Amino acid sequence: MTRSLKKNPFVANHLLRKLDKLNTKEEKEIIVTWSRASTIIPTMIGHTIAIHNGREHLPVYITDRMIGHKLGEFSPTLNFRGHAKNDNRSRR
């Protein structure tokens, strides 16, 4: 279910403050965040945001094609290592 157009996209306040500060200074530095639910907005383009995946922060460079998506979509939390090769219990 999509968000209502009457509402604005969710972006964490601390993330907006950091972005506004960097945009006024015209500096580029890595922004560390735990807010995976924040929506990518046009003011984030060109910045690198380190998104927490539960274990570490993964740096993601924001491009114009990412607008409207959530930050958590670009930081996978699970690491699938494949199925067991010799699983004799499941064959019984």
UniProtKB/Swiss-Prot annotation:
GO annotation, biological process: ribosomal small subunit assembly; translation
Gene3D superfamilies registered for this protein in UniProt: 30s Ribosomal Protein S19, Chain A
Database matches in Pfam families: Ribosomal_S19 (PF00203)
First-listed, main subcellular location of the protein, grouped into a coarse class: plastid
Hydrolase found in the keyword field: no
A GO term for molecular function: rRNA binding
Compartment(s) of residence: Plastid, Chloroplast
Any one cellular-component term (Gene Ontology): chloroplast
Disulfide bridge map: none
Keyword terms, alphabetized: Chloroplast, Plastid, Ribonucleoprotein, Ribosomal protein, RNA-binding, rRNA-binding
InterPro entries linked: Ribosomal_uS19, Ribosomal_uS19_bac-type, Ribosomal_uS19_CS, Ribosomal_uS19_SF
Entry annotated with the keyword Acetylation: no
Domain of life: Eukaryota
Summary of the function given for this chain in its UniProt record: Protein S19 forms a complex with S13 that binds strongly to the 16S ribosomal RNA.
Family per similarity comment: Belongs to the universal ribosomal protein uS19 family.
Entries under PANTHER family matching the protein: RIBOSOMAL PROTEIN S19P FAMILY MEMBER (PTHR11880), SMALL RIBOSOMAL SUBUNIT PROTEIN US19M (PTHR11880:SF8)
Name the record gives this protein: Small ribosomal subunit protein uS19c
Organism: Fagopyrum esculentum subsp. ancestrale (Wild buckwheat)
Taxonomy of the source species: Eukaryota, Viridiplantae, Streptophyta, Embryophyta, Tracheophyta
